[in-house]
Amino acid sequence: MDIKTVRETAFAMPLTSPAYPPGPYRFIHREFFIITYRTDPAKLRAMVPEPLEVPEPLVAYEFIRMADSTGFGDYTESGQVIPVTYEGKPGTYTLAMYLDDHPPLAGGREMWGFPKKLASPKLVTDKDTLIGTLDYGPVRVATGTMGYKHRELDLAEQKRRLERPNFLLKIIPHVDGKTARICELSRNLMIDIDMKGAWTGPASLELAHHALAPVAELPVLEIVEARHIIADLTLGMGEVVFDYLAQ
């Protein structure tokens, strides 16, 4: 294969059979279970990179079921997302996500900079309870529960919240194994959102300590709200807003 062909066909690895296809990436009937809780403010600020700012010591613990996604297939994801501001405007910062499917794991890390690890999350309904769990190997590290569809939420308001920008710290190591080749803050949006439903109810969240899935490093001090959302949406491509290596 000549250099020109490599340059023109290169998208992702392996060159001749990429781990994921080009976008756009559309999600049908994407199901969110989000528990927002209050945590230790000093620990939280220590985990959020500047120039992002933390207005309140809050964390959104998410379980997300994606049964029908373009190119990525059928998978589930779980992790912690932090409400932040950037240049005075509200958004979110994804601290860590754990999922059970290779294409979105590879694509999420390589394209946007999603901090993804392989694990075993689940989101199910058992009779009258919405249940989210995260296992890292044989160890249960997160359990969330909520009363199933106790009260409807305003769809327009929930759509506005989903439309807020999400920020990611994208890090790609150099081939020397010692330094970062890429270290940048990226921003992406969920677009073309079609809301199917949104509900709330009484909720609980338990986090357990694990060396490699340290979700409990941001302890649960108080449950603030819980949301169950179903929507069709497209995960938009990203843009770089801050380059740490250029400073």
From Swiss-Prot:
It catalyses: acetoacetate + H(+) = acetone + CO2. Its EC number is 4.1.1.4. InterPro entries: Acetoacetate_decarboxylase (IPR010451), Acetoacetate_decarboxylase_bac (IPR023653), ADC_dom_sf (IPR023375). GO terms for molecular function: acetoacetate decarboxylase activity. Pfam families: ADC. Keywords: Decarboxylase, Lyase, Schiff base. The active site is at K116 (schiff-base intermediate with acetoacetate). Catalyzes the conversion of acetoacetate to acetone and carbon dioxide. Belongs to the ADC family. NCBIfam families: PRK02265.1. This is Acetoacetate decarboxylase. It comes from Ralstonia pickettii (strain 12J).
